[in-house]
Amino acid sequence: MTGCVPRSWRPWFLRSGAMLACFLATGAAAQISIDIDETQRISFESGNFDVRRYSGEMQGVSYFVDNKLVMTADQIDLETGGQPKEGSFFVKSLEVINAEITGEDLLFSSAIARNVDFGVLLGEHSPVRNVSFDAGAAGFFDDSFLQVLGIEFSDELATVTVGNVETLDFVFDQLPTGERYARNGGLLIDDLRFDLGTVNREFKELADTLAARGLRAAEFDFAVSQIANFVGGELRAEHAFNLVMDEMASLELVSGFEVKLATLVALESMAAQGRAKESEMLNLIGGIELASLNATYLDAGLVDTLVDVMAAEQNVSPAEMRSSLRSMLTQTLEGMLPRNGRRMARPLETLLKQGGGLEVSVRPQQPIILSNFLGFLIMPDLALEQLGVTITHLRDQ
């Protein structure tokens, strides 16, 4: 794990974070309105803000770009370590209350930050810099904390609400070469809900079928976390991903990786230089090994719902659909994996027939270099055997 923020979410966080950092770094003294530059302006209705300390409070805040309102907030309370310096803007505490990003249909009820260097955080989020093992956590410290509550955003396809997003406890340490790494870190997201908006005509029948079975919205809780330690000349990291779909299913994924010290140093060097060649990145794969992987899926109605939906679409009974799926699954796996297909298919068939859950385990006799996975694609049967892959059906509790 290179940080605590999933990569696919970074553009949204960075766009909002960059705008907020520019917003706060300008200062506001006692004026009602301040021109930041030729295009940006901040105004607030009341408050007490000390531009020398870059600290204070503002109420009724508005942020404009090219005279267009971009963001509003009921209140902002800010305490910093002083004026921004080159590449650094340390925020001791920040609270933003009832903010709205205008034109984006995005708002949140509260955002809190403690002991975060926003200058470093925003400066480290280029694609090249993210090759660094620590880049995703740049700007954070052992006592850092971020939390956003009551997030809402929508478009014509869906409305998304998030009850709570917060960072888990950070613990940082140093490699023998002096580079920093995160021993502990992570992100927690509670009450993530997708409500379908306008459904395209070709999907309306499916949406109606799902709604009839109680799936008018999808609700999730999930967390990602990392535990890492430097042992015997390599960094051993365990990453965990937990996902719960309310009253439907849950998934836990735990992986273990081992990264050679020379590889970590090379990653840091690439990040510092601001460049990375594809050939260099491929060579580094030889220093990263998969030690273990375990996935546990527990079903609490999701499989039944999906089978019912497919049966309704094909105008057959759920029992017929289950039988058809089991046959298709067995034929497909036996065709792809002549030696192991039947063994892999059996627990999946049992899940379709009886419910319950699945545990997929990868336990190689010794850690597998990631570059070997290219060869495994050509010989999948051999891959399963060398990786020690097993699938076990879990009975319904």
Which residues does each PLM region occupy?
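N-terminal secretory signal peptides that target proteins for export/translocation
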Residues: M1-P11
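Sec-dependent signal peptide recognition
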Residues: R10-M19
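N-terminal signal peptide c-region/cleavage motif recognized by signal peptidases
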Residues: A25-G27
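Glycine-rich, small/hydroxylated-residue low-complexity segments
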Residues: Q31-Q397
